[in-house]
Amino acid sequence: MHCPFCRHDDSRVVDSRTTDDGSSIRRRRQCPNCSKRFSTVETASLSVIKRSGAPEPFSRAKIASGVRKACQGRPVSEDDIALLAHRVEEAVRAQGAAEIDAHQVGLATLPFLQELDEVAYLRFASVYQAFDSLADFESAIDRLRAQRAAVAVPPVEPVAARG
């Protein structure tokens, strides 16, 4: 790493810390030539391969924008959307690949959106899973109902009042 002050071609790492969101590393460095200190922020690059084949840097804002459209008119806050976009980015980065297909990013979004809002999930899924008929929607709704029934907890019977 070049020193920004004297352009010396080497520096020593004095301290390393992850950023608050854990997506990058902040390093405090010192130049052995001029002894001045400076900070760097290092982030692993992640490229999304578009349908056209062109790569583009991963954008959490694009995830949020797509989810925001699916959530339009739904009781979902901006904080919920931002958290979902962060979780999608974490899931995509956890795969360890430097490049990922745009369609895969959309599919990675689905489980988090299903957890957040089922109607928004159906809207989003209809695009990313290319629904082209009413039967596709019915099938997705049936899967949601089956998943809900599988995790449903029977209601607790009220305890009779003691006298």
UniProtKB/Swiss-Prot annotation:
<dbReference type="GO" id="GO:0003677">
    <property type="term" value="F:DNA binding"/>
</dbReference>
<protein>
    <recommendedName>
        <fullName>Transcriptional repressor NrdR</fullName>
    </recommendedName>
</protein>
<comment type="similarity">
    <text>Belongs to the NrdR family.</text>
</comment>
<keyword id="KW-0067">ATP-binding</keyword>
<dbReference type="InterPro" id="IPR003796">
    <property type="entry name" value="RNR_NrdR-like"/>
</dbReference>
<dbReference type="InterPro" id="IPR055173">
    <property type="entry name" value="NrdR-like_N"/>
</dbReference>
<feature type="zinc finger region">
    <location>
        <begin position="3"/>
        <end position="34"/>
    </location>
</feature>
<keyword id="KW-0547">Nucleotide-binding</keyword>
<comment type="function">
    <text>Negatively regulates transcription of bacterial ribonucleotide reductase nrd genes and operons by binding to NrdR-boxes.</text>
</comment>
<dbReference type="Pfam" id="PF22811">
    <property type="entry name" value="Zn_ribbon_NrdR"/>
</dbReference>
<dbReference type="GO" id="GO:0045892">
    <property type="term" value="P:negative regulation of DNA-templated transcription"/>
</dbReference>
<keyword id="KW-0678">Repressor</keyword>
<keyword id="KW-0479">Metal-binding</keyword>
<dbReference type="Pfam" id="PF03477">
    <property type="entry name" value="ATP-cone"/>
</dbReference>
<dbReference type="GO" id="GO:0008270">
    <property type="term" value="F:zinc ion binding"/>
</dbReference>
<dbReference type="InterPro" id="IPR005144">
    <property type="entry name" value="ATP-cone_dom"/>
</dbReference>
<keyword id="KW-0804">Transcription</keyword>
<keyword id="KW-0805">Transcription regulation</keyword>
<feature type="domain" description="ATP-cone">
    <location>
        <begin position="46"/>
        <end position="136"/>
    </location>
</feature>
<keyword id="KW-0862">Zinc</keyword>
<keyword id="KW-0238">DNA-binding</keyword>
<keyword id="KW-0863">Zinc-finger</keyword>
<dbReference type="GO" id="GO:0005524">
    <property type="term" value="F:ATP binding"/>
</dbReference>
